[in-house]
Regions:
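Aromatic-rich, lipid-facing transmembrane alpha helices and their immediate juxtamembrane interface loops
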Residues: 1-146
Length: 146
């Protein structure tokens, strides 16, 4: 649940920033491109956070999430950055486009062999550097309070 809430902070911010920041290449049918789409992306990204937890359980010894661990955070960070790059590779320029703006510059140019000429911008990448840290700190606080 907390992953969905963390994610909704940027999904709905992106929505409020409008087409100047990002726009859909493909519109959802039946007028579902606004809030419903952002809500579904928030739920999906909550699942991505949970997959990061699963990776920790798969590759690290127990006990987990009882105190700060660079290995736990490292796995969550690596997963967050990897999946963001993969999602951008698959969908950026095909489903959505983030505009190159002074405060959201292109930091990775279009990849050779890619089906799109759109580069990767700063804000979506930065989100997935910061968000796993917030999620991880929440997990530690949750474990401490139980």
């Amino acid at each position: 649940m907390i992953g969905c809430l963390i994610d909704s902070t940027w999904e709905f911010t992106f929505h409020f920033l409008g087409d100047e920041f990002a726009y859909a290449v493909k519109q959802w049918p039946l007028g579902l491109s606004g809030w419903p789409k952002k809500l579904s992306h928030s739920i999906w990204d909550g699942g991505l956070f949970m997959f990061g937890i699963w990776l920790c359980f798969k590759y690290l010894p127990s006990p987990l999430f009882t105190r700060f661990s660079w290995r736990e955070l490292g796995i969550m960070e690596a997963w967050g950055i990897f999946q963001e790059l993969l999602v951008e590779y698959l969908f950026n320029g095909r489903v959505w486009v983030y505009n190159d703006l002074p405060w959201n510059p292109v930091i990775i140019p279009p990849l050779p062999g890619s089906a799109t000429t759109v580069g990767y911008t700063l804000i979506p990448q930065a989100v997935w550097v910061v968000a796993p840290v917030l999620f991880y700190l929440f997990l530690l606080r949750l474990a401490k309070n139980q």
